[in-house]
Amino acid sequence: MAALLELEGIRRSYQSGEEIVDVLQDVSLTINAGELVAIIGASGSGKSTLMNILGCLDKPSAGIYRVAGQNVDELDDDALAALRREHFGFIFQRYHLLPHLSAAHNVEVPAVYAGLGKHERRERANMLLTRLGLGDRVSYQPNQLSGGQQQRVSIARALMNGGQVILADEPTGALDSHSSVEVMAILKQLQQQGHTVIIVTHDPTVAAQAERVIEIKDGRIMADSGSKNEPVVAAAELMSLTPAAPSWQQLVGRFREALLMAWRAMSANKMRTALTMLGIIIGIASVVSILVVGDAAKQLVLADIRAIGTNTIDIYPGKDFGDDDPSTRQALVHDDMAALKAQSYVSAVSPSIGGSMRLRFGNIDVAASVLGVSDEYFRVFGMAMEQGAPITREQVERQAQTVVIDLNTQRRLFPHMKDVVGQVILVGNMPATVVGVVAEKKSMFGSNKALRVWVPYSTMANRLMGRSYFDSITIRIKEGYSSKEAEQQLVRLLTLRHGKKDIFTYNMDSLLQTAEKTTQTMQLFLTLVAVISLVVGGIGVMNIMLVSVTERTREIGIRMAVGARSSDVMQQFLIEAVLVCLIGGALGISLSFAIGLIVEMFLPNWRIAFPPMALFSAFLCSTVIGVVFGYLPARSAARLNPIDALARE
């Protein structure tokens, strides 16, 4: 008869300080298929180490171990996991059930790693539990079951993938006498069905029930009774369970099950999961809120600047602001305005002549800023009218004594009058008819309290100031033309006309660009602060996951014992970290929506928009945080030695 398990000259040594301790010495053993074997020995005799080597949980330091003719030393970690998953079933003294899973889910765990389908897996688990007398307790948690019932769940788990070889470590050690008898009867029945059953015990009464007893002492086999009866070699009904599903379906199924297991693990520690998410929620909400609220603030600033007049260029006499050289003060004249208006890139032109004068109506006398402008001035600066109409070309040509006032002036001169068009006021000493009132512009910079009025520039020059030159000329560039290139061309034009460069310009687009750059810089700074909070949240996730790995070390050992590969363990903990971060990210985005609504409630002029790219980036960021900060705990879990993990309390 071909041997199922063969050990030749097995030695297992451990480093203990500076000394090397031999736990197993020159162990040679052959176990045939269908045998019921008991390995008996006192505590420290090496029997548990021998069982770990037989179950491929550990490797010998020397010697050869073959399973069905295959040298175990030639197998990598994944192949060893496959061997445990497909051929071995473990029954532990302390049951080693996962506390957050039901009895049925505990039994299903080995089949999850074998890639068995969900429905087939569930039917098989229920069938095994029913066969072992637990059909009415499939949904019970381990803490709702007695010791004997928990051990039967452990037996069902060992049989889930076939359990060609059943390794039972002190299976009756934690049970009462009645439960012990039941468990031993089940193990004998499994041997009769064709399973190879190996029991490790220190109890001679338990060992005596086996057909073959092997005594071990101080790491050496002292006695081997040999098999009393011819072993049953008929194939067990549950031996072969090779899933027929294609590999990609197995991968999808494993990922789905890992996701479910991650969710169950998170649900088992709701408070800790919520506190872990809190850092991610705050971080994501901060980043998204700063992006969208910052963008709303930026758009409001730019809108205010555009209201002043975008795509416009102001031309001033002299070299720069504050230049009071008399030779350049009169540089800008009417002919310059006409020459500029003829340029192809110019949409509108308006000269400006300014001064401070007294305004009077009845017995009210106030100081105001008076500006002489052309009919195109109001279009250049995008100014709307509250009442009446702006200055017209006809009024400019005939030096009309007309005036346009702002709302501040209306409130001061006409405090009890709503319609003021047609009223006559004194501008300086000149009577002027009010033809329009400029509408007030809402601005985040606040309201301007100064009084301003506008008259035709021809009226200002000839009737009020008595001069023919302008203080400045403002031009509006046509859409589609580069403001910078237009600025260079008009400077070149006026320099040629004047024979020298006696003017300077101020491009409003440069103010717009400066404001945009400044707001972007501030937004970037605030975003970096928010990202720091997100990183802190990620570190919190890593910290909690490392704690979780430590707390769940025995669970990791159980999963490895039933066939989980290192990659399966790593995948599960990575998925848990990513799931925490994704849910935290979703809640963070929801919080940022609430923040946006509150901002709009208190600041109605702000338009909060959540672009899809920002939301996608937030979810991507959550995923990356989960992967980056979940990798170290996941790797730590995957690198655990199953023997050490199972021994951890």
From Swiss-Prot:
Q: Fetch the InterPro entries from UniProt.
A: AAA+_ATPase (IPR003593), ABC3_permease_C (IPR003838), ABC_transporter-like_ATP-bd (IPR003439), ABC_transporter-like_CS (IPR017871), MacB-like_ATP-bd (IPR017911), MacB_PCD (IPR025857), Macrolide_Exporter_MacB (IPR050250), P-loop_NTPase (IPR027417)
**Its Gene Ontology biological processes?**
response to antibiotic
Provide the E.C. number(s) assigned to this enzyme.
7.6.2.-
- SUPFAM superfamilies given for it? P-loop containing nucleoside triphosphate hydrolases
Q: How does it sit in the membrane?
A: Multi-pass membrane protein
Question: Which residues does the UniProt record annotate as the domain ABC transporter?
Answer: 5-243
Q: Does the keyword Cell inner membrane apply?
A: yes
Keyword ATP-binding recorded: yes
Q: What class of enzyme is it?
A: translocase
* Segments traversing the membrane: 274-294, 420-440, 524-544, 578-598, 608-628
Q: Which GO terms describe its cellular component?
A: plasma membrane
Where, subcellularly, is it found? Answer: Cell inner membrane
* Domain of life of the organism encoding this protein: Bacteria
**A Pfam family recorded for this sequence:** FtsX
Q: Where does this protein hold ATP?
A: 41-48
Recorded GO terms, molecular function? ATP binding; ATP hydrolysis activity; transmembrane transporter activity
Q: Which residues form a coiled coil?
A: none
Any idea which UniProt keywords this protein has? Antibiotic resistance, ATP-binding, Cell inner membrane, Cell membrane, Membrane, Nucleotide-binding, Translocase, Transmembrane, Transmembrane helix, Transport
Q: Give the family from UniProt.
A: Belongs to the ABC transporter superfamily. Macrolide exporter (TC 3.A.1.122) family.
Instruction: Please give the function described in this protein's UniProt entry.
Output: Part of the tripartite efflux system MacAB-TolC. MacB is a non-canonical ABC transporter that contains transmembrane domains (TMD), which form a pore in the inner membrane, and an ATP-binding domain (NBD), which is responsible for energy generation. Confers resistance against macrolides.
Subunit comment:
Homodimer. Part of the tripartite efflux system MacAB-TolC, which is composed of an inner membrane transporter, MacB, a periplasmic membrane fusion protein, MacA, and an outer membrane component, TolC. The complex forms a large protein conduit and can translocate molecules across both the inner and outer membranes. Interacts with MacA.
NCBIfam families associated with the record: PRK10535.1
Protein's recorded name: Macrolide export ATP-binding/permease protein MacB 1
Q: Which organism is it from?
A: Yersinia pestis
Gene name per UniProt:
macB1
